[in-house]
Amino acid sequence: MKLVLGISGASGIPLALRFLEKLPKEIEIFVVASKNAHVVALEESNINLKNAMKDLRPSATFFNEQDIHASIASGSYGIHKMAIIPASMDMVAKIAHGFGGDLISRSASVMLKEKRPLLIAPREMPLSAIMLENLLKLAHSNAIIAPPMMTYYTQSKTLEAMQDFLVGKWFDSLGIENDLYPRWGMN
């Protein structure tokens, strides 16, 4: 399976890193981090995003967001699934309105036109009517809208356990088997 992980410049970059860390090793992963993602990672978490990604998944293929001619920008390359974690509202708007001027939005547009799973984890609060309309437009185009919302029923005691719940739910939405969180009724 081939999966693209897009990392936009929204708050919550550690969630993308946890997704990358927990992704099963047999999945071929392609990563595109926006310029703003690198800035936000450093400002919010003191993380050098380039180094962190390579440390977590040395076998991944990394692309520059401006490399619009990359293999993953074409439907014929055969990417199976894509996740954008976190998804800024700027990125959401670009995808919702068909703008593909960078590799993340172009790859997302390809997923929509090819009717392949595209998971979007929007990071913003509160949401304006415009933001909600853009998310609704994407949902109507079969994108999976999966914001990182906390859980209480798992009784998570650590930040890592909460992150694992989110990553596990995202994996579930993408059809990736996992045991990252306790299932309801399975205790």
Curated annotation (Swiss-Prot):
InterPro entries given in the database record: Flavin_trans-like (IPR036551), Flavoprotein (IPR003382), UbiX-like (IPR004507)
Family designation: Belongs to the UbiX/PAD1 family.
Protein name as annotated: Flavin prenyltransferase UbiX
Broad class of enzyme this protein falls into: transferase
Keywords: Flavoprotein, FMN, Prenyltransferase, Transferase
Catalyzed reactions: dimethylallyl phosphate + FMNH2 = prenylated FMNH2 + phosphate
Residues annotated as binding FMN: 9-11, 34, 123
GO MF terms held by the record: flavin prenyltransferase activity
Binding site for dimethylallyl phosphate: 153, 169
E.C. designation(s): 2.5.1.129
Lineage of source species: Bacteria, Pseudomonadati, Campylobacterota, Epsilonproteobacteria, Campylobacterales
Function: Flavin prenyltransferase that catalyzes the synthesis of the prenylated FMN cofactor (prenyl-FMN) for 4-hydroxy-3-polyprenylbenzoic acid decarboxylase UbiD. The prenyltransferase is metal-independent and links a dimethylallyl moiety from dimethylallyl monophosphate (DMAP) to the flavin N5 and C6 atoms of FMN.
One Pfam entry name: Flavoprotein
